[in-house]
């Protein structure tokens, strides 16, 4: 299905509007002169850990301990993330390192 030029322009305008709205809305709602509300500060503290926990559970939900590789690559990859983070305290390094360990195990070992 092809779109007419008008439909294409409307689609592009809506995407631009949506992108700009999500970028600028926080600055309009919370101007720099006012203090940030306590609930927003609270969410800023608890949401990162909650999101990471949710992602870990989502990634491990289909791991079968009774078949295939018995979840060994996932366990070793998760352990690599934990150990790298305890050692270097760098989230990007931890996630990237755990991903590399997991992919090497899945592609070359199991």
UniProtKB/Swiss-Prot annotation:
Cell compartments where the protein resides: Cell membrane
Main location: membrane
Keywords: Amino-acid transport, Cell membrane, Membrane, Transmembrane, Transmembrane helix, Transport
Species classification: Bacteria, Bacillati, Bacillota, Bacilli, Bacillales
Role, per record: Involved in branched-chain amino acid transport.
Single GO cellular component term: plasma membrane
Name of this protein: Branched-chain amino acid transport protein AzlD
Membrane keyword on record: yes
Family the UniProt entry places it in: Belongs to the AzlD/HI_1737/HP1330 family.
Gene: azlD
């Amino acid at each position: 299905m092809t779109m007419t030029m008008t439909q294409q322009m409307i689609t592009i305008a809506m995407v631009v509007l949506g992108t700009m709205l999500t970028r600028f809305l926080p600055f309009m709602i919370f101007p720099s002169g006012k203090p940030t509300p306590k609930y927003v500060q609270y969410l800023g503290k608890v949401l990162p850990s909650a999101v990471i926990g949710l992602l870990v559970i989502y990634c491990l939900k289909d791991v079968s301990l009774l078949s295939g590789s018995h979840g060994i690559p996932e366990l070793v990859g998760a352990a690599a993330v934990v150990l790298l983070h305890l050692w270097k305290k760098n989230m990007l390094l931890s996630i990237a390192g755990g991903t590399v360990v997991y992919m090497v195990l899945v592609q070359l070992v199991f």
